[in-house]
């Protein structure tokens, strides 16, 4: 399913985990050296174990362990038991089991002794080369394989019997594996190291061993499946024998146990029944068997077994893995680890088990040293994991690892917290129950893994069949996941934790009828789960992202686990694979919502969610844990399923809050296709990986929520709700983390009952809606908003989320403007107090719809006052009554705007703690006609209302009264109800926040009562349509006499009667509207004169209104009043009045004409259609203002005229220039004249002196220049003379040269002449020589 390499039974290619130990697992030849790739293809391993040097090496390593210098085989059983007792290990079992158990413990002790704080130091790095050459080990391994085959067959039968009883224990075993991961890093590292050492020393051994076993194991699980019915019966008859056989088999092969677990997965349900019977008897045996298995698994056979089991389980897992996908998340992690180091993991598991036994003893004594060891282990593990991670296995494994990465993160947190738990384990190692309990504490500190493990444990009823049957698969899935995890460190941590959990799980479950231990561990884990609830509040912060990822994983896990859960029944009825595939698909949808999904999701869910899930599972399982084993297993399985569903829901919610809408879509799809449950489960691994990133996205997975909600168990739902508030806002989660987890728990417990019931209903409805929403949200373009479904999810999330969560949601909405998911978050302002509490969980605010998308646009929506009570009454069927939900449907653009407004006004609603803001949704005017401002205001109001309006839906938890905002009605009654007033014109629904009154009784009015109301202190955002709707509630407005200033800061409203005006003032005075308004509206009566003045019909402002306005707070920016004029002269006053009257009449006539001209437009304008009325109204306001300004200017001119007389005084005082900007000047006095003249004379003298000096300087300069010129002339003459002289010399030289040349020529000529003469002479001589002589010379 995960795309891992599937080794052939012959082990052709096996990816082996190589730790940082520097051991090369490549060919099993013990090359020591760093492993460059995490995975390596190993050559075909010989099937004969004896021929495998790695196996022999591993065996030799195991064999070399001595006690007091004596080989363990030489010790008597009593000595072995005494040694085991010293180490707090189980003493039951055959000698071989005791030897192996003791060996594991001793190896662990040695590891701890030799382990250094440096992760780089790998104690096993030197062992590799020596071990593979030991022929004895090869023979031993061959024998072991034979024994393993026999015992595997035996175990398959026994396991089939035990599976039924131990189905739960199987899951617990899976959880113990998780517990191992929960174990402190020391344990894990020690476990990992032994396993790694074993694997490093016996890579081949493990591979060949696993190959041989692979065949037998693969066959045996299948045989076990076929024999499951027979084996179940035989197991019920042979519990003790099966335990001993399991011990032997465990000694031989932990992988056998894994296979047995796989077989058990098929037989889990039967085993669960038997498990109940055998749990008590098997506890001790399980402990012993576990220890034996630890030691056995510490041996190479375990590695091979793991590999073989990997192969078998892979073959099985193909059907099962779909079912077990959630377990597969664990298993895939384990398998990833197993496949990479399948052998290593098995050996590691064995070694870990033995080491865990030793560690438990040592940790009892060395609890103090645990932190150091943990640090060392962590460092070594991180190094190992890093080295392993460098060469990730195939992408499928990476996909698996991606979920594992989440788990590693959880594991990291677990490892961080585990030491105390380890201490607990160390203190009570002897009993597996104690160990399990300790594991549970470990789970608590490391809630992520715990929840992965313990929720599986709690869900073991559902998951055990699968998980226990495939411990190897779980290990593999865990190991590949963790191994391949993108964060290598995380994956190592995941591996370590998973592997350590596996050893623990195997200790607790494999050796003994894993059923008993599984059941016990389930009980114990479920018991500690409450602790994890507390713990996971802190863990949330650590693992919020992992939680998100894991929540996705959980979703997938749920699907897978749903499939798995059905698988258990299916396995019982048919072959594991066939039944798994069929039953998961058939029951995947039902069972998914219960335990399996939650189980799988829990492992995948982020640590926080896991913790919550675990806590939930524990909370629910604790009551069940107490009952007898039978009831325990049943109740545990139930509680597990509940906790799973809770954890799934919580994790899904967590993921939802970040933006798991995609995830939820995926999960929803998966839920939709129960038949595809297995397939979906198988793909879920990759999907998880994909989803994990998505989870981070701010979308909410409604379907996930729906699933969680759909889980019928009230407790689960309540827990889910609790978790949901926590998850709702990571901030809240962090805050909760910061808060003591205990605080969350009490609240959770208090609200559990009430919320569980309500939340169940809510969750069911929400689940359906959310699923729809998920699909729609994914499929729709971002512009489209799945309107109703998202609202439901939002309601759920809002209710669940604290206030911060709601705000975050709205922020998310605003951040995701493309998908216009307008969520009118009807989350009460008490959310802030409730953050992290489950108080708000039940509450589900009404859905938000996009603007204009209301189902009945023209219908009047019945007014719903959304109060806690009304929401409670609604919750049973949250389905929105047609149009009754206080839902605002936005057009796409509106929704965008409203989202922006939500961002702007997101926090406005909560400023008044004492107020509850009710919002009235009205449908107004055709969408087309609205002004932009109006639309914005509507939308802004909508978000505003959304933020504060959200009353808690089903939060029955008694919240501190101050937290709940009082709903004050601003209309005549003080109970503000949410009213939907639809104006038939419409298409656009306008949401109006009902005014919020702070003072019960409005103060007495200042002005005389009249039918005109002046409302000031208006603060945007709001639209004229919204304002008029608000004003129209208490009376009929006279449209023509309505005036509002340009910036909408104050308005004059004229009502048809004085009574309506009085009602309006009573309703609106001292009220906050819109909700974001920081000021309180001031409503008072006004006179017609003031209205006329503001409308521009009156030039002078009435004196009363002036006084009134001076006394009353004016709007932010009222139109600037004309400058105060000094009292004009009576004549001017008279003239002014006449002019004002004339202008008034002219203005009124113009107004009448204009009205007639634009009657239709004005009507549109009045209705605020969007076409252009806004600009029209603006231009009208502008015209009015200009008119007012022009009047002001005229009055100013008059004022100037009146002020001129004092200006003439200036003329009297000063003399004035005639130029336009007249300059005033004064003549000088006599003294000044004398002084000035003296100064002038002085200046003249100064100037003269300066002039003379300047002339002298110039003269000197001229003389110097002339001198310089003369010198220059002389220089020039000299140069000329020089050049002439030089020319003459040159001439002379030339003549001399010519003469010389002539002489030379003559000499040459004479020489030539001589040469010619000599030639001629010699020629004549040679001619005269006799021929004889010439011949003789020849």
Swiss-Prot record:
Q: Name the residue ranges with Polar residues bias.
A: 425-434, 506-518, 744-754, 855-866
Q: At which residues is Phosphothreonine found? A: 253, 417, 423, 975
Q: How is it modified after translation?
A: Undergoes proteolytic cleavage; the processed form is active, contrary to the uncleaved form. Phosphorylation on Ser-1179 by SRPK2 up-regulates its stimulatory effect on cyclin A1.
Q: Which residues carry this modification: N6-acetyllysine?
A: 861
Q: Where is the cross-link described as Glycyl lysine isopeptide (Lys-Gly) (interchain with G-Cter in SUMO1)?
A: 267
Start-end of Basic residues biased regions: 1175-1192
Q: Per the record, where is site Cleavage?
A: 1093-1094
Location(s) in or outside the cell: Nucleus; Nucleus speckle; Nucleus, Nucleoplasm
Biased composition of type Acidic residues is found at 161-171, 269-290, 936-945
Q: Where is the composition biased (Basic and acidic residues)?
A: 219-228, 313-353, 542-559, 757-767, 798-815, 892-915, 1130-1174, 1193-1214, 1236-1317
Quaternary organization: Found in a mRNA splicing-dependent exon junction complex (EJC). Component of the heterotrimeric ASAP (apoptosis- and splicing-associated protein) complexes consisting of RNPS1, SAP18 and different isoforms of ACIN1; the association of SAP18 seems to require a preformed RNPS1:ACIN1 complex. Interacts with API5. Interacts with SRPK2 in a phosphorylation-dependent manner.
Q: What name appears for this protein in its UniProt entry? A: Apoptotic chromatin condensation inducer in the nucleus
UniProt lineage: Eukaryota, Metazoa, Chordata, Craniata, Vertebrata
């Amino acid at each position: 399913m995960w795309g891992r390499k599937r080794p052939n039974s012959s082990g052709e290619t096996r990816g082996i985990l190589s730790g940082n130990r520097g051991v090369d697992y490549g060919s099993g030849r013990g090359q020591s050296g760093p492993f460059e790739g995490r995975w390596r293809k190993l050559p075909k391993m010989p099937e004969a174990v004896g021929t495998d040097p790695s196996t022999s090496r591993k065996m030799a390593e195991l064999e070399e362990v001595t006690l007091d210098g004596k080989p363990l085989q030489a010790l008597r059983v009593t000595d072995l038991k005494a040694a085991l007792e010293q180490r707090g290990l189980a003493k039951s079992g055959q000698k071989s089991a005791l030897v192996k158990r003791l060996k594991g413990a001793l190896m662990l002790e040695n590891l701890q002794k030799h382990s250094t704080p440096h992760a780089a130091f790998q104690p096993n790095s030197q062992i590799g080369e020596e071990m593979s050459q030991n022929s004895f080990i090869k023979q031993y391994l061959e024998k072991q394989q034979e024994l393993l085959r026999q015992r595997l067959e035996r175990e398959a039968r026994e396991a089939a019997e035990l599976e039924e009883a131990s189905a739960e224990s199987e899951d617990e075993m899976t959880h113990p594996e998780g517990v191992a991961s929960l174990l402190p890093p020391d344990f894990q590292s020690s476990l990992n190291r032994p396993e790694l050492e074993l694997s490093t020393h016996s890579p081949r051994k493990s591979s060949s061993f696993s190959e041989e076993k692979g065949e037998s194991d693969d066959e045996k699980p299948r045989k076990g499946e076929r024999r499951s019915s027979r084996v179940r019966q035989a197991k019920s008859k042979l519990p003790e024998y099966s335990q001993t056989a399991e011990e032997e088999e465990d000694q031989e092969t932990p992988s056998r146990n894994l296979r047995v677990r796989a077989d058990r997965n098929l037989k889990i349900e039967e085993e669960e029944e038997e498990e109940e019977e055998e749990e008590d008897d098997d506890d001790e045996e399980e402990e012993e068997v576990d220890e034996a298995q630890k030691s056995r698994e510490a041996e190479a056979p375990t590695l091979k077994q793991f590999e073989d089991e990997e192969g078998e389980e892979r073959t099985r897992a193909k059907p099962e893995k779909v079912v077990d996908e959630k377990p597969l998340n664990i298993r895939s992690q384990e398998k990833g680890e197993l496949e990479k180091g399948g052998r290593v993991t098995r050996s590691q598991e064995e070694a870990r088990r033995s080491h865990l036994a030793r560690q438990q003893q040592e940790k009892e004594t060395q609890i103090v040293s645990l932190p150091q060891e943990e640090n060392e282990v962590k460092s070594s593990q991180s190094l190992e994991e890093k080295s392993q991670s460098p060469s990730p296995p195939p992408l499928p494994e990476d996909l698996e690892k991606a979920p594992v990465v989440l788990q590693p993160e959880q594991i990291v947190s677990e490892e961080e917290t585990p030491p105390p738990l380890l201490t607990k384990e160390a203190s009570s190692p002897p009993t597996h129950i104690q160990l399990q309990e300790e594991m549970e504490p470990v789970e608590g500190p490391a809630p992520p893994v715990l929840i992965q493990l313990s929720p599986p444990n709690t869900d073991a009823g559902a998951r055990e069949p699968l998980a226990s049957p495939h411990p190897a698969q779980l290990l593999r899935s865990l190991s590949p996941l963790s191994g391949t995890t993108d964060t290598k460190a995380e994956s190592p941590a995941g591996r370590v934790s998973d592997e350590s959990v596996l050893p623990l799980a195997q200790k607790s479950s494999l050796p003994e009828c894993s059923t008993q231990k599984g059941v016990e561990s389930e009980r114990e884990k479920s018991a500690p789960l409450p602790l994890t609830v507390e713990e996971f509040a802190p863990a949330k912060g650590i693992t919020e992202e992992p939680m998100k990822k894991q929540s996705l994983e959980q979703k997938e896990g749920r699907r897978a686990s749903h499939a798995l859960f059905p698988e258990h029944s299916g396995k019982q009825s048919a072959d594991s694979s066939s039944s798994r595939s069929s039953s998961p698909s058939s029951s995947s949808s039902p069972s998914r919502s219960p335990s399996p999904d939650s189980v799988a999701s829990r492992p995948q869910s982020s640590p926080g969610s896991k913790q919550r899930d675990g806590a939930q599972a524990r909370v629910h399982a604790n009551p069940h844990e107490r009952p007898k084993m039978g009831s325990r297993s049943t109740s545990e399985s139930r509680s597990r399923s509940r906790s799973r569903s809770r954890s799934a829901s919580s994790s899904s919610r967590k993921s939802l809050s970040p933006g798991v809408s995609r995830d939820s879509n995926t999960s929803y799809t998966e839920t939709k296709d129960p038949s595809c449950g297995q397939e979906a489960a198988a793909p879920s691994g990759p999907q998880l990986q994909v989803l994990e990133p998505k989870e981070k996205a701010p979308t909410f997975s409604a379907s996930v929520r729906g699933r969680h909600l759909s889980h019928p168990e009230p407790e689960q739902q309540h827990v889910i709700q609790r978790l949901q508030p926590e998850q709702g806002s990571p901030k809240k989660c962090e805050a909760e983390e910061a808060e003591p987890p205990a605080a969350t728990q009490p609240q959770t417990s208090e609200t559990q009952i009430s919320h569980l019931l309500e939340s169940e209903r809510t969750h069911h409805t929400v689940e359906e809606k959310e699923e729809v929403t998920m699909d729609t949200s994914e499929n729709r373009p971002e512009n489209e908003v799945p309107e109703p479904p998202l609202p439901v999810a939002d309601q759920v999330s809002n209710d669940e989320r604290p206030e911060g969560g709601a705000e975050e949601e709205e922020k998310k909405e605003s951040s995701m403007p493309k998908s216009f998911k307008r969520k009118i978050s009807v989350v009460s302002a008490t959310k802030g107090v409730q953050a992290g509490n489950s108080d708000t969980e039940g509450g589900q605010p009404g859905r938000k719809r996009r603007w204009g998308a209301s189902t009945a646009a023209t219908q009047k929506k019945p007014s719903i006052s959304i109060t806690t009570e009304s929401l409670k009454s609604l919750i049973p069927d949250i389905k929105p009554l047609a149009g009754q939900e206080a839902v605002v449907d936005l057009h796409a653009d509106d929704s965008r705007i409203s989202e922006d407004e939500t961002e702007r006004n997101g926090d406005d609603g909560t400023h008044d703690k004492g107020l509850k803001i009710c919002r009235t949704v009205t449908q107004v005017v055709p969408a087309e006609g609205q002004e932009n401002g109006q639309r914005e205001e509507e939308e802004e109001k909508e978000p505003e209302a959304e933020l504060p309006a959200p009353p808690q839906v089903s939060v029955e938890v008694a919240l501190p009264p101050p937290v709940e905002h009082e709903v004050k009605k601003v209309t005549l009654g003080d109970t503000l109800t949410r009213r939907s007033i639809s104006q038939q014109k419409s298409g656009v629904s306008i949401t109006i926040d009902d005014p919020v009154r702070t003072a019960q009784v409005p103060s007495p009015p200042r002005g005389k009562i009249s039918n005109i109301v002046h409302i000031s202190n208006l603060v945007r955002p709001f639209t004229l349509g919204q304002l008029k709707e608000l004003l129209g509630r208490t009376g009929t407005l006279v449209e023509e006499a309505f005036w509002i200033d340009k910036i909408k800061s104050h308005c004059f409203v004229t009502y048809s009667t004085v009574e309506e005006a009085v009602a309006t003032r009573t309703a609106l005075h001292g009220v906050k509207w819109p909700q974001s308004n920081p000021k309180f509206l001031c409503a008072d009566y006004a006179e017609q004169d003031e209205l006329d003045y503001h409308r521009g019909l009156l030039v002078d402002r009435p004196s009363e209104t002036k006084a009134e306005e001076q006394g009353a707070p004016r709007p932010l920016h009222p139109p600037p009043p004309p400058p105060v004029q000094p009292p004009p002269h009576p004549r001017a006053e008279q003239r002014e009045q006449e002019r004002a009257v004339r202008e008034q009449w002219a203005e009124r006539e113009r107004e009448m004409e204009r009205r007639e001209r634009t009657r239709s437009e004005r009507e549109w304008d009045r209705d605020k259609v969007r076409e252009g009325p806004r600009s029209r109204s603006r231009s009208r306001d502008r015209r009015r203002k200009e008119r007012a300004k022009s009047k002001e200017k005229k009055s100013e001119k008059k004022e100037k005229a009146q002020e001129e007389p004092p200006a003439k005084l200036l003329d009297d005082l000063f003399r004035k220039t005639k130029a336009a900007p007249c300059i005033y000047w004064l003549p000088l006095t006599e003294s000044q004249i004398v002084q000035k003249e003296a100064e002038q004379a002085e200046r003249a003298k100064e100037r003269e002196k300066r002039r003379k000096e300047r002339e002298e300087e110039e003269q000197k300069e001229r003389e110097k220049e002339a001198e310089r010129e003369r010198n220059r002339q002389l220089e020039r003459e000299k140069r000329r003379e020089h050049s002439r002289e030089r020319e003459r010399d040159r001439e002379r030289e030339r003549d001399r040269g010519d003469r010389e040349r002539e002489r030379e020529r003559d000499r040459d000529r004479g020489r030539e002449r001589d040469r010619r003469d000599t030639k001629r002479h010699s020629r004549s001589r040679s001619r005269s020589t006799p021929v004889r002589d010439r011949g003789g010379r020849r």
